Amino acid sequence: MHPKVDALLSRFPRITLIPWETPIQYLPRISRELGVDVYVKRDDLTGLGIGGNKIRKLEFLLGDALSRGCDTVITIGAVHSNHAFVTALAAKKLGLGAVLILRGEEVLKGNYLLDKLMGIETRIYEADNSWELMKVAEEVAEELKGEGKKPYIIPPGGASPVGTLGYIRGVGELYTQVKKLGLRIDTVVDAVGSGGTYAGLLLGSAIVNAEWSVVGIDVSSATEKAKERVKNLVEKTKELLGINVKVQEPRIYDYGFGAYGKIVKEVAKLIKSVGTMEGLLLDPVYTGKAFYGLMDLAKKGDLGESVLFIHTGGLPGIFHYGEEMLELLV
């Protein structure tokens, strides 16, 4: 880890959920095709359940919940949410209760199937986006308090200042690995949904004085909202840490193809191509769109000569949308 990051984060309660450093993998065939060195930070291999980026945030979020004496976690997401499932699974692992506030069609596939297999309490509502359900989460929290419980609300994607600490710590790990391997990285690329991971990458990179730029790929086609959310998270996290560092302006590009969760032929073909060329599995909601954006920007010369992709996980998305993807590939 990075000593400056360790010192900054030492006063915040953290539960260890990731037992190892996630590896950095080189993609030789993709690199040859693009004429750019492409590396992947395998945060799909974080170890708990289906893995993924959210577990870095949960180390601090659940550490905070336990330090406050909370006994039940409430969080929000789409029916196929990776974040919602791993949050509930991690909570159960720690002996906590969990309630998931979900939106979308109730279909027993992907993460929703895992929710049911693990006996996780789910409540389905109608909403255009997960942030609209924060009020519902607060109402559920009041209901649980009436039952004598002490709930802890985690916002969509774990996008809060406390959650952002997880990716500041992740940058400390990444920076140390890159130096140890003797790599020069021009650009780090990340999928942007709720924005917490990207905010942590921006702030963490500023703290360690990294030489790379951090690019976000908007998977929801809500780029201006994403930029504002990221800026707000960065400022609030700086306040939490008590620091004042200059942070790169968000560089977020729209590759959402019109909407969050919209499955398109271009991304389905990309997922197949990357899988067969490199043995690397991407999902159609987050990492597939983000890697599509990476390849398009790299071809335009916008990412420099060496790029590192943060693989944020999301494998169940393949199974949730598998039939749609197969139809698009015919």
Curated annotation (Swiss-Prot):
GO molecular function: 1-aminocyclopropane-1-carboxylate deaminase activity; D-cysteine desulfhydrase activity
Keyword flag Hydrolase: yes
Spans through the membrane: none
Repressor listed as a keyword: no
InterPro entries in UniProt: ACCD_DCysDesulf (IPR027278), D-Cys_desShydrase (IPR005966), TrpB-like_PALP (IPR001926), TrpB-like_PALP_sf (IPR036052)
Any Pfam family the entry gives: PALP
PANTHER family in the record: 1-AMINOCYCLOPROPANE-1-CARBOXYLATE DEAMINASE-RELATED
Name the UniProt record assigns to this protein: Putative 1-aminocyclopropane-1-carboxylate deaminase
Organism whose genome encodes this protein: Pyrococcus abyssi (strain GE5 / Orsay)
